[in-house]
Amino acid sequence: MSSSTPKDTVDTAETPKVKDPESQAWSDDKRRKFETKSKSEFYDPCQEAAQASYRCLFRNGGDKNMCGEYFQAYRDCKQEWTEKRRREGRGWF
């Protein structure tokens, strides 16, 4: 008879991705999508990180303490995106 303890269970939840070239905040593909969108259209290159944060909150019943890594991944993505846009010297619109 085996009982399941927290250390016996495997967490199959996704974890934030680490600096994968495909998930860069400001890749050439994301730059092209941002520059070709209409002015009234909203485009967030960090949408994947935002959705992962929401999924984490949903999985954990809204407990923000359980999702700190996801929030930090989103903040890092947003910061990287804004810094690259600033360095390029382009405006937001």
UniProtKB/Swiss-Prot annotation:
Region Disordered, annotated ranges: 1-40
GO BP terms in the entry: mitochondrial respiratory chain complex assembly
Residue interval(s) of motif Cx9C motif 2: 67-77
Start and end residues of each CHCH domain: 43-85
Keyword terms of this UniProt record: Disulfide bond, Mitochondrion, Transit peptide
Disulfide bonds: 46-77, 56-67
Cellular component terms (Gene Ontology): mitochondrial intermembrane space
Motif segment (Cx9C motif 1): 46-56
Compartments where found: Mitochondrion intermembrane space
Domain of life: Eukaryota
PROSITE patterns, alphabetized: CHCH
Major subcellular site: mitochondrion
Record-linked InterPro entries: COX23, Cys_alpha_HP_mot_SF
Sequence similarity: Belongs to the COX23 family.
Protein function: Required for the assembly of cytochrome c oxidase.
Name assigned to this protein: Cytochrome c oxidase-assembly factor COX23, mitochondrial
Organism: Gibberella zeae (strain ATCC MYA-4620 / CBS 123657 / FGSC 9075 / NRRL 31084 / PH-1) (Wheat head blight fungus)
